[in-house]
Each structure stands twice: as C-alpha cells, then as structure tokens.
Amino acid sequence: MSVILEHLPTGQKVGIAFSGGLDTSAALHWMKQKGALPYAYTANLGQPDETDYEAIPRKALEYGAEIARLIDCREPLVREGIAALQSGAFHITTAGVTYFNTTPIGRAVTGTMLVTAMKEDDVNIWGDGSTFKGNDIERFYRYGLLVNPDLKVYKPWLDSAFIDELGGRAEMSEFLQKSGFDYKMSAEKAYSTDSNILGATHEAKDLELLSSSIRIVQPIMGVAFWRDDVAVKAEEVTVRFEEGFPVALNGTTYADPVELMLEANRIGGRHGLGMSDQIENRIIEAKSRGIYEAPGMALLFAAYERLITGIHNEDTIEQYHENGRKLGRLLYQGRWFDSQAIMLRESAQRWVARPITGEVTLELRRGNDYSILNTDSPNLTFKPERLTMEKGESTFSPRDRIGQLTMRNLDITDTREKLLTYAKSGLITLSHGSELPKLNSGEKN
C-alpha cells in the first residue's frame, strides 16, 4: 500500500520541513488555506548562510502553522560527519579531489530528527520541498519510514493542485503578497545552494551547463581562491586526533565537536580548501553536476588519512578504501542506517579509527594546494631505521634479502609458465629482444 499522498489531506495534521524560504512559506500558507493543519519543523544544521534561526519558527506561525519548532541538529550532524570521515565514506572523487557527502549526511540527520519530533506531536504525515527528480525525495522517504512506520508522505510539489496554482517562484511570491504578507522575492541566483555545518552544495540552473564553471559561484564557507584579487596567505595548522576523533586545532582542545568543526571551517575556508567540481550519478542513475564546499571536513580528512598511512599496514588501508567507497554509495542513497552500512561503519570505527592518535601539521595555500610538514603519533609503524642506507644496526641483513628473493622464484616460475600457456592459445605474443609481451585480440588464428 502506497504511503504517498497525491492530494492534500484536509483536516489532518501535516508536518512540513520549514526553511523559511519562498517555497516552504508559500506551501505552508497554501496548505492552511486549503484546510490542512500544518505543523512546522525547522532543522538548525548550522547553515553558514543563515543568520537568525529563531526567526524561522516565528515566520511559520505567521504563515499559519499550528505549532512551529526549531530542532537543534548540529551536534548529531557533526557526530555523523566524523563517523563518515572515520570510515572514509566518500565515493565521489575527480582526480583525487573528494566530495565529502555533506548533503547526504545532513539528510540522514534531518530526516530522522524531524520525523522523531513530529511523532512526539502525533503528526504522521510529512511534507518537504524535495522534487521528484532529485535524490532527497528518496532519502527523506527512507529515513522517515525508518523512524515512523506509520508515516504518510505528502509533498506539495507532487500535488497537481498545488502545481497548477503555485507552480513557480513568481506565482508563490504573488500568492503571499495577496494574502497580506510583505514577502519580497529575493533576486534569483544563477544556481541553487543547500548547506549545513559540514559543507555547501551549489547546483542546478546555470551550473547544469558544464561550460559554466566554478567561477560563477560565490562561496559561502570560504574564499573564491581562483580570483587573482583575493589575497590568500599561506598558513600552518596542526590537527590532533585521539582514538580516531579530532580533538584539537593549533593546540586548542575542543570539548564541543560543533565548535571544533566551526573552527576547522574557518581555517580551511580562509584558503578555499575542500572545494570541488563533481559530475555524479544520482540515485536514479541520471548524471548531475555539483560544486561543493567542505573546508573543515577537508582539513580534518587530510590529517586523518595522513595518520592512517603512517599507522596501518597496506592491506588494512586497501580494505578501508574499498569499504569506504561502498559505504559512501550507501550514504548517498539514503541507506546510512541500513544494516550493511552499519557493518561497514562499525568495522572502520573500531579497527581503523581507534588507533588514530597523533598530530599532523599542514601548510595550507590556495584551494586544495597544501603540504604536510610533520606527522607525529605514538602508534606510527613508520620506522626509518628499518630501511636506512647508512651503516649500523639493521632489522634484516643482505643475506636475509637474498633468501626472500630466492623464495620469489616460485611465483616467477609460475608466471613464466602461465605466459607460455597464453602464448600457445594466441592471447599474447611473447617478447623478442627487449619487447614486452603484447596482448592480441584473443581470437585464435
């Protein structure tokens, strides 16, 4: 049985994720006029472009909400962001530059916390502003039903009656003005922005054209590092981790992870660290493009992965990367709390993150240009004396290496025989002189 309501349920409580923007303001007032009982829930996600969170619920009451609540999601959001960092749960990269899944993390927290608040108010119908072509409609759907199995979903943007009356920004603005509200539609940007304390997403409109570059974006978490008139001075920063958790920046320890993330954002933002331009596959498999900011996450991740490479062995690091990519996809798809995601995350937090204690000093320059100046940890397995070319005590001798190389003869012989087998079947041509083996078409002559 479908839990999607295609038409407004009049006379019933309808929870709406209320941002205070034009879309949700018009939707809330429209639902009130049509006979529903709107309950407004606003998530404080530490959005860097929001200046007055307390004013948002007051707006909702003015537009007709029965009640309006502000839910502080910042601490859980930072906690989940650090869990994603510990797990390397990031699968979208271009030439080594990472998207830190900041919007999917935000949706996991928003979806669960707002529906929990609605449940407390006996509200079992939820509406939000996600569109039918995007990822969020599925993310919110999954997280909402995980929290409340009796939840019904009503989205004004899937209701033909709402679309017919208020299908565009101009129509919504006119509707509010005719209803007696002094709502002035803000100048429309060349792209849309969604943000939280972990990062910002810029997408749609002009950014749907690949010929429109990062240059049209005005960062909200840092500087436009690509502009020659923007001064960016090199800066040294030290990040300290204890058992996988970031705890200090430049010698200052933070008991509150929210304050630590805010300071990491300020430091990274001064350089434009963590900005990326990505082409990605949405949940529905259509490709989209986004320009992302995540200065604090990028700073912490650079230090975290440096410690990982100095502490863990190659096989552990390989498994961490493989599992992280899988977990990143699950997170992106709205499956952060699914059993397979919990398994991958728990494994990384327990066996990879726990030994990560130490300090990393970096020099930040412009954008994602930085150098690592020092790495220190009591758990380092990096031991220069093991490989020193100078005379002195050594962990192994030349004779030990001769024995190790002799043992390699076994698999070298196996490889040679396998190449001969491939050559006989026509798959490769054996080398002559200095040539390497060459692949053939694979077809027998």
Swiss-Prot record:
Signal peptide: none annotated. Homotetramer. Belongs to the argininosuccinate synthase family. Type 2 subfamily. ATP binds at residues 17-25, 43, 129, 131, 136, 194. GO terms for cellular component: cytoplasm. It is found in: Cytoplasm. Its EC number is 6.3.4.5. Pathway: Amino-acid biosynthesis; L-arginine biosynthesis; L-arginine from L-ornithine and carbamoyl phosphate: step 2/3. Keywords: Amino-acid biosynthesis, Arginine biosynthesis, ATP-binding, Cytoplasm, Ligase, Nucleotide-binding. L-citrulline binds at residues 99, 135, 139, 192, 201, 203, 280. It holds the Pfam family Arginosuc_syn_C. HAMAP family: Arg_succ_synth_type2. It catalyses: L-citrulline + L-aspartate + ATP = 2-(N(omega)-L-arginino)succinate + AMP + diphosphate + H(+). It is an enzyme of class 6 (ligase). The keyword Ribosomal protein does not apply. GO terms for molecular function: argininosuccinate synthase activity; ATP binding; protein homodimerization activity. CDD domains: ASS (cd01999). It comes from Acidobacterium capsulatum (strain ATCC 51196 / DSM 11244 / BCRC 80197 / JCM 7670 / NBRC 15755 / NCIMB 13165 / 161). This is Argininosuccinate synthase. InterPro entries: Arg_succ_synth_type2_subfam, Arginosuc_syn_C, Arginosuc_syn_N, Arginosuc_synth, Arginosuc_synth_CS, Arginosuc_synth_type_1_subfam, AS_cat/multimer_dom_body, AS_multimer_C_tail. GO terms for biological process: argininosuccinate metabolic process; L-arginine biosynthetic process; urea cycle. L-aspartate binds at residues 131, 135-136.
